[in-house]
Amino acid sequence: NSHTGRDIFALAENLAIFQRASALEKELGVPVAHEMHRGRVTFSAPSTVLLLDALPDMRLTADFSHWCCVHETLLEDQGESVERAIARSFHVHARVGHAEAPQVPDPRAEEWRPALEAHLRWWQRIVDVRKASGASTLTICPEFGPAPYMVTLPGTGRPIADLWEVNRFMKDFLTDRLVV
């Protein structure tokens, strides 16, 4: 997993970085997946699609939570770009984002069910595409993080949910709901 490039670099600068990463990948025999992440060139659907067009061998770490935050939607209007990213995804960061933040406070809460189900659909598509391509593996990491990703109570800094329990829930949710 690599946090490659920056959102503030020109496309040519980012392409040079990705081409170097690709050369290292080939030289060392270590696969590299470039994470979809805010602050990186993969921060948005359109910027990522530009890279996918220019770099036919580019692999992604799918973290749609960042795109939800950046685009302020559950990506209903980004279907083609989401499918393009799914087709290149080799690793999944299973964090659930929403229109205003890259991490829901607690995916077990009913008010976050639409966001959880949207992410599950994307993750299932990744599983399906990987299987159809003959891939024997797909790695998935529940990736709910501590503050500042995790919302805290004002004045105390205490997290509003138990991070360990949230990630355990995600592991169990993925095990129960993904059809592999």
Model region roles, listed by residue range:
Residues 63:
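Active-site glycine-centered loops adjacent to acidic/histidine catalytic or metal-binding residues
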Residues 49, 54-59, 68-180:
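Histidine-acidic metal/acid-base catalytic patches
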Residues 1-60, 165:
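Active-site acidic/histidine proton-transfer and metal-coordination neighborhood
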